[in-house]
């Protein structure tokens, strides 16, 4: 949030430059996700999350110092975006694998709901604060505040006292090489219809959502003439929406069925962005409409996130959690750099309104893929845990 807004509002970055900045920050997903999955299955997730939080705090702290010294131009932003992106890849894979090591499988939905709810709470104030700091004070101050929040996360995770169980390879087998473990994760995901559908649906969503967000961050300040504070406030509405989605995820799937919830929530959450290109002006009505759009998107996208995570964790053996999460991130989130670049290209060629409409329509491919897959037929209970032994790692 801070780096893209700084590029647009302070450096007057164009659509192509903003697309490139977002793509550089997302490129580590393609470069590191699969390796991160292999590491996570052999390390304590708490250790990895602590180290990566410390690294992100240091990187953004360095950006703050560079900004105060007048060195924070686009090249420096690209470096910081890449470093923070690389560390975030490892953190996210470890985060997704951590819960299975800490709770029983029948508590996964409730546990994911609680975890994602706490993460959503951070989204309520984060974007608004970041936008306000960039707009009212300066980008270095905003970067320093982000560094402080990562440091706070570092301290919080260090306080986790419960000991996690690390999956061990069979003693009779030599530990496999990293690339062999990566191949095992890929093969497991491709061989499971539900997981492979999650991959494809995630790829479709992330590709078009990245394009939407690149155009969105140009459309709000330039076409609608919104300040950085107003942009941050609009994006912050995703937070309370996601908090509501986390609470609903603990109840709705068991009442209406996991498949019904996945498909309908994805269609509603993704489809709401189709209303944004119709907005004009910077009136209070426009800001209110943006708040509603982001709230609805946050609610239903989080409902999908928590439900998908519970399904994935249930059908995956304990010793494969990191690699399966990383494979899905690689296929899904790996599309974001290309989507960001596409958003920049479309905005320059067609303008922001048309580009936003096309990219938002593309997001509906994700629920369509889920509707045509076995995921749509999931009932009110999670699938049975796998009995297949995990390949030695």
What kind of feature is each model-predicted range?
Residues 1-393:
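Alpha-helical transmembrane-bundle signature of multi-pass membrane transport and export proteins
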